Amino acid sequence: MLPILFSPDATSWENFGLGVLVDAISCEAEENRNGSYELELTYPISGAHFADIALRCLVVAKPNYTDDPQPFRIYNISKPLNGIVTINAQHISYDLSKNVCMPFSVVASSTACNTALQGLKTNAVETCPFTFWTDVDTVASYSQS
């Protein structure tokens, strides 16, 4: 699968976004267990979509032959060297790591797990574009401080 470029605010990957990066020289994702999940893309400045590539844009690519395509957010674009830039992107899940959550608590009930997850979303300092769900039905209390 060729990598596809999307605008920073895209939430669906079911189209070709800003365009397919057919001119990409290489595109490799690296996932370390309990560690980083990053993508490195090399692209020529003469490529059809070079002008569209910007910080915070999303690149959707297959991390390997078996997994589904995954979105990665661009955080670094190198200066051109011999007409080629190196683009670094982190998996979109890293967007959550910079979003602080205000304190809240959930009392024990049959919906405590889902209520706690919704509390994380509604009490986030910045708007959270992610949705949360679980099939865990454990009855327990939760407190975020």
Regions found by a protein language model. Name each.
Residues 1-107:
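Assembly/oligomerization scaffold segments
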Residues 84, 90-145:
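Charged- and aromatic-enriched interaction segments used to assemble
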